[in-house]
């Protein structure tokens, strides 16, 4: 019985990326083009997290609404499309890749600051968010690799690979790549 409890705890922990201590200092890009953030982005890869645990075929739509954007995040679970909606806007100088997000899911509104760690402002974004847990004295990392297409190619792919190789924050071994197969993306009516 104890073995099953330990196994369940290990499985639950592996669904997220946790570290001891405070969130690391990260430096967002300083050449961010907020206007190019708008539109559709495919979730090519991410750190596993319990909110998106079973989701496949993930993508986000950012629709301008004044100085902010409406955020709609979608994914498919067992043939059903799910979405989370909210708003986002730049934190401070819009050239700095720091974006405030306010999203509601599961009846709860969550707020975070998404740090753009790398982007070419056209084809890809590597984003990072950290959540500190005071009780556990540790933090959970969230990482997303977003692309304008379902597959990174050419210069965008090379730039992402080069960033991941040299990143002191993102562990590429922990990234889970999205399934965009016809079966994964199929929505049953």
UniProtKB/Swiss-Prot annotation:
Q: Which organism is it from?
A: Pieris brassicae
Give the subcellular location.
Secreted
User: How the protein assembles, per its UniProt entry?
Assistant: Homotetramer.
Instruction: From the Swiss-Prot or TrEMBL record, give the protein name.
Output: Bilin-binding protein
Annotated disulfide bonds: 23-130, 57-185
Q: Which InterPro entries match?
A: Calycin, Invtbrt_color, Lipocalin_ApoD, Lipocalin_CS, Lipocln_cytosolic_FA-bd_dom
Q: Which PANTHER family match?
A: APOLIPOPROTEIN D
What are the UniProt keywords, alphabetically?
Bile pigment, Chromophore, Disulfide bond, Pigment, Secreted, Signal
């Amino acid at each position: 019985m104890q073995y099953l409890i330990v196994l369940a705890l290990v499985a639950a922990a592996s669904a997220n990326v946790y570290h001891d201590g405070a969130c690391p200092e990260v430096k967002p890009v300083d050449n961010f083009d907020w206007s190019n953030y708008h539109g559709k982005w495919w979730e090519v890869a991410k750190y596993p997290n319990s909110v998106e645990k079973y989701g496949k075929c993930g993508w986000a739509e950012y629709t301008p609404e004044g100085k902010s954007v409406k955020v709609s995040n979608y994914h498919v679970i067992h043939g059903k499309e799910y979405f989370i909606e909210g708003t986002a806007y730049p934190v401070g100088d819009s050239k700095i890749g720091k974006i405030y997000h306010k999203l509601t899911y599961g009846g709860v509104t969550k707020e975070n600051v998404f740090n753009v760690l790398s982007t070419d402002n056209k084809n890809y974004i590597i984003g990072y968010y950290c959540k500190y847990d005071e009780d556990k004295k540790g933090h959970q990392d969230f990482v997303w690799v977003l692309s304008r297409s379902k597959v990174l190619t050419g210069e965008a792919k090379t730039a992402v690979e080069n960033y991941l190789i040299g990143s002191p924050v993102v562990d590429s071994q922990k990234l889970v790549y999205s399934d965009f197969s016809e079966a994964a993306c199929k929505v049953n009516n």
